[in-house]
């Protein structure tokens, strides 16, 4: 199982984020931007969720906090146009990483956005990451199925896995959908986004089960 994130051999690496609203997608992008900025990479964000009031501003705020550039247009703009501008900018100005936010309810738009990216960078997007809220259990599984039907999801970002993590959902996603979990969000802090380590996770899950039985 491939839990690692894939990067471009040369030129910008593009990660496309999908998922319904309210699962922590934009927050995940902000945290990942922080991680790569700390590693010394040049990071660009694309505000492709142009339909939700506040989504553009939320991403712009993350850009300010982290200190990275954000490509955005006014609300109700065509998301594909935003992403096109971002991809062109990433290529021309030698960005290492481009993280693309998308609207939650427009799964049909995701493929259009992907085509825009691939036209400019043939092997991109290098990851299509589906954000799921770990606390929603079966609902998360249903969402994953819906997104997997319309677009080629390459991995899962599991958010809100802090505290008494309902971790069984990870196993369900892996078993039913054959999708690797690549990142987990463990809290609200900037560095609370971790690479998913299956072994560590299984040990944690087992400990949780043992504790419950006592």
Regions found by a protein language model. Give the residues of each.
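Short acidic/polar alpha-helix capping motifs at helix-coil junctions
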Residues: 22, 50-51, 109, 136
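Acidic active-site catalytic centers that drive phospho-/nucleotidyl reactions
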Residues: 25, 49, 101, 133, ...
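Primarily NTPase-proximal linker/entry elements flanking Walker-type ATP/GTP-binding cores
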Residues: 1-48, 55-78, 82-91, 97-100
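Short glycine-rich anion-binding loops that position phosphate/pyrophosphate groups of nucleotides
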Residues: 103-105
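Conserved catalytic-core segment of NTP-binding enzymes
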Residues: 58, 78-93, 107-212
